[in-house]
Each structure stands twice: as C-alpha cells, then as structure tokens.
Amino acid sequence: MYDYIKGQLTKITAKYIVVEANGLGYMINVANPYSFTDSVNQLVTIYLHQVIREDAHLLFGFHTEDEKDVFLKLISVSGIGPTTALAIVAVDDNEGLVNAIDNSDIKYLMKFPKIGKKTAQQMVLDLAGKFVEAPQETGHTKARSNKAGNTQLDEAIEALLALGYKAKELKKIRAFFEETSETAEQYIKSALKLLMKG
C-alpha cells in the first residue's frame, strides 16, 4: 500500500495524471487533473490510495492529506465507490459537503454525481460527526494566463463528463461561460458551484 509518491509530473489527461518516479510512470486518477497544470515537468508530491481489483490495480491521488481523508471517509460508506468518491472530492470546497452531512441535508448531498436518496441518507448515518473540522479547500488554486478560452472550456467540459455529469447539464454550463476567458481549472471550479446549486 502506498502513502504518497514524489516524482516528476509528465502528463495530464481529463481523468488522470502521470507521475514518473525511479524510471516508472504511475497513472494516477485525480479529482481535477487540470489543477496540476502549473506543475507539469516539475517535482510533485501526490498522496495516494490504492484500490486492488481482479482486473486492475488503481491509484487515486490527492493534493493534500485532508483531501485524501475526505475520500477515504466517503468510500467507507456503503454504495460509494472510488470513482463516485473522487467525483465528490472534485468540488473544490468540501466545507459544504461536511456541513450537509452534519446537518442531514439530504437534498444537498443528492446533487453530487451518482448519489441518490438512499446513499445520501447512508452518508449522514455513517459520517455525521466524523469530520473534526472542515477540510481545507482542495486542489491548487493558482491562476495562470489564458490565451485560448474555448480550448480551456473544452478541457473543463471533458473533465466534468469524466466525473459523471451529463452532457445536457454541461450544455448549459458551456453556454454560460462561452464568452469568458479562464483556465480549465477555474472553469471546473465555477461550473461545479453552479451544478451544486442546481
């Protein structure tokens, strides 16, 4: 079992990043790959959780130990697998998640991808009071210059599709941001806030 990896970030896709360490490239599933954009070809430390299946050994990575802790608590809930947990963690500010769990806000929890009423209730039952304090904002928030807004928006939409959001929902998101110019990370962050509001 791995705790973290330190190596050079060599590749970013809509679903995962690749970190090279000791001559090996590790494919790591992360909540928001584009939040690592500023770290390409640089040394990074990624906190890890390994999932072993019959057909695959999967690595899930996180910017911080707080982010990893949220993920681990989520996958302890019946009905929530690693992919769903990662989609939930993708919402940068997890304070809302913690507050919803502690206050039994089922409707809020059901706005997360693939979370129905039964699973939301189970989240409250299993996790209420388990978070000592709201975790810090997850992911990197450094802004970078953007000269190709539409390209960045395309990347953001692709990442949101990978997180489980439907094309119909994202069509409205694209229209909302079409005339703006942001980084993919900023688009994802803003889009998630709108999607959570319904």
UniProtKB/Swiss-Prot annotation:
Protein name, per record: Holliday junction branch migration complex subunit RuvA
Matches recorded under Pfam families: HHH_5 (PF14520), RuvA_C (PF07499), RuvA_N (PF01330)
Region (Domain III), start-end ranges: 148-198
Any one biological process term the GO annotation gives: DNA recombination
Chain positions covered by the region annotation Flexible linker: 143-147
4Fe-4S listed as a keyword: no
GO CC list: cytoplasm; Holliday junction helicase complex; Holliday junction resolvase complex
Quaternary structure (record): Homotetramer. Forms an RuvA(8)-RuvB(12)-Holliday junction (HJ) complex. HJ DNA is sandwiched between 2 RuvA tetramers; dsDNA enters through RuvA and exits via RuvB. An RuvB hexamer assembles on each DNA strand where it exits the tetramer. Each RuvB hexamer is contacted by two RuvA subunits (via domain III) on 2 adjacent RuvB subunits; this complex drives branch migration. In the full resolvosome a probable DNA-RuvA(4)-RuvB(12)-RuvC(2) complex forms which resolves the HJ.
Residue span of region Domain I: 1-63
Organism of origin: Streptococcus pyogenes serotype M2 (strain MGAS10270)
Function: The RuvA-RuvB-RuvC complex processes Holliday junction (HJ) DNA during genetic recombination and DNA repair, while the RuvA-RuvB complex plays an important role in the rescue of blocked DNA replication forks via replication fork reversal (RFR). RuvA specifically binds to HJ cruciform DNA, conferring on it an open structure. The RuvB hexamer acts as an ATP-dependent pump, pulling dsDNA into and through the RuvAB complex. HJ branch migration allows RuvC to scan DNA until it finds its consensus sequence, where it cleaves and resolves the cruciform DNA.
Chief place where the protein resides: cytoplasm
Top-level taxonomic group: Bacteria
UniProt GO MF annotations: ATP binding; four-way junction DNA binding; four-way junction helicase activity
Disulfide bonds: none
Keyword DNA damage part of the UniProt annotation: yes
Domain characteristics, as noted in the entry: Has three domains with a flexible linker between the domains II and III and assumes an 'L' shape. Domain III is highly mobile and contacts RuvB.
CDD domains assigned: UBA_RuvA_C (cd14332)
Region (Domain II) residue spans: 64-142
InterPro entries hit by this protein: DNA_helicase_Holl-junc_RuvA_I, Hlx-hairpin-Hlx_DNA-bd_motif, NA-bd_OB-fold, RuvA, RuvA_2-like, RuvA_C, RuvA_C_sf
Subcellular location: Cytoplasm
